[in-house]
Amino acid sequence: GSIRQPAAFCGVIGLKPTYSRVSRYGLIAYASSFDQIGPIANNIEDIALVLEVIAGKDRNDSTSSSLEVPDYSKLNFNKSSKKIAYISECINHKGLDPEIKQNFLLKINELKNQGFLVEPISFPLLDYLVATYYVLSTAEASSNLARFDGINYGYRESNVKDLNEAYILSRNTGFGEEVKRRIMLGTFVLSSGYHDAYFTKAQKIRRKIKNMVEEIFRSFD
């Protein structure tokens, strides 16, 4: 499942590491270019300790990074030298709950009082994030989840008459409604005539989003 949103909903801390920092060995792949393992804990100190343990090269995952794992639990920094950015479009979004907005602004003031430099930034591609995510992730999911056919992988329905029925009933029973919807959407965006219109375009938007985020981190921590 996700890391950051569930952590936010539960009032705890969640960290989604950089892709390849933590091995994905043992994970059931949903969308390979998005899937990442990360810790959820009550405090940042525990997050650092857990990340030290789970990060690093894994011979069972060729995508895992061979870069040295820092002593995250020993990291310290001068608050006054750190610049934090927040997206102004999020604060002014019409769907934002007033109570959440109020608490968010209170947290900004709290961080400023602690010595952090906090500034608003604009992120024009904000409204494209969800659509881009769904196109790319469902496309990858339709491919990854195709292996769960009830024969080689996944749940197998026992009361079947032939191989074709085994495939149909196993996948129909083994997958939930949301998973089925995502597989169907992914199959659609990868189909002939729609691949360039949806999947290729979403890849280009993701590249623009990546470039924009990298530009932000040139000025902020």
Segments the model singles out, each with a brief description of its role:
Residues 1-11:
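FAD-binding core of FAD-dependent oxidoreductases
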Residues 71-72, 96-122, 153-155, 165, ...:
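Acyltransferase
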Residues 78-87, 139-210, 214:
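Short helix-loop capping/hinge segments that flank enzyme active sites or metal/cofactor-binding pockets
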